Swiss-Prot record:
GO cellular component: cytoplasm
Ranges in coiled-coil conformation: none
UniProt keyword list: Cytoplasm, DNA replication inhibitor, DNA-binding
GO biological process: negative regulation of DNA-templated DNA replication initiation; regulation of DNA-templated transcription
The protein, known as: Negative modulator of initiation of replication
This protein's record includes keyword DNA-binding: yes
Function comment: Negative regulator of replication initiation, which contributes to regulation of DNA replication and ensures that replication initiation occurs exactly once per chromosome per cell cycle. Binds to pairs of hemimethylated GATC sequences in the oriC region, thus preventing assembly of replication proteins and re-initiation at newly replicated origins. Repression is relieved when the region becomes fully methylated.
InterPro entries for the chain: Arc_rbn_hlx_hlx, Ribbon_hlx_hlx, SeqA, SeqA_DNA-bd_C, SeqA_DNA-bd_C_sf, SeqA_N
GO molecular function annotation: DNA binding
Protein location: Cytoplasm
Family: Belongs to the SeqA family.
Summary of subunit composition and partner proteins: Homodimer. Polymerizes to form helical filaments.
Superkingdom of origin: Bacteria
Length: 215
């Protein structure tokens, strides 16, 4: 795997093109450049100096010398998939979400709630209200290419198109709808993916997990 230094503006652009949770930077660049999908998972785009120079010669441009530095790094295993957030959140923003979610989990109403679907909707509601932009980007990943089901939508009709059995419910205080006919494990997986994309710590995800465990 190769590492190449890019400026902040270019990084933000590449990251904003994420289409699915777990999509690697290589996958994004291959799609943007209309290159065939690699047969090997997480194969990095090999941007060596010679490759970069030849590409820029075709475009009639020259890449600044300081951006040509590449370094060898070990190739990540399949368990170390690169998750590329659409926009990097500040530590303060992340901590704000963490605090709000913890307040919900520790609230008397949440602790006494017996319906798992209500807990599910309440957590999604807090995630949206604390950072609508990041939540929107996260839910888009769940409805993007590669998914066999549509989990989130901005209207009930979109989810009902897959059948009345999906039991769409509007997430409280948000413009989003979500299917609710999933089992507890799937609900937790949906929350986990969303929270990971929003860059929330694994410790917080682990605090949520027991509320969706099958007793």
């Amino acid at each position: 795997m190769k590492i190449i230094e890019v400026d902040e503006e270019l990084y933000q652009y590449i990251a904003s093109q994420t289409k699915s949770i777990g999509e690697s930077a290589s996958d994004i660049l291959r799609r943007l450049l209309n290159l065939p999908v690699s047969g090997v998972n997480l194969t990095a785009v090999d941007l060596t100096q010679s490759t970069m120079n030849s590409t820029n010669e075709e475009k009639g441009t020259q890449l600044p010398a300081e951006k040509n530095v590449v370094a060898e790094t070990p190739k990540p295993s399949s368990e170390q998939e690169i998750r590329t957030p659409a926009r990097k959140q500040s530590t303060q923003s992340i901590q704000h979400i963490v605090t709000k979610v913890k307040n919900l989990l520790q609230s008397e109403a949440f602790q006494e709630e017996s319906k798992m679907v209500v807990r599910f909707l309440n957590i999604l509601s807090v995630l949206y209200r604390t950072n609508p932009e990041s939540f929107a980007q996260a839910t888009e990943q769940e409805t993007s290419q590669g998914r066999t089901r549509t989990y989130y939508a901005r209207d009930e009709a979109t989810l009902l198109a897959a059948g009345n059995h999906t039991k769409p419910r509007q997430i409280p205080d948000t413009p989003y709808w979500v299917i609710t006919n999933t089992n507890s494990g799937r609900k937790m997986l949906m929350l986990e993916r969303t929270m990971q994309f929003m860059e929330l710590p694994e410790e917080l995800i682990d605090e949520v997990r027991p509320y969706f465990a099958v007793v």
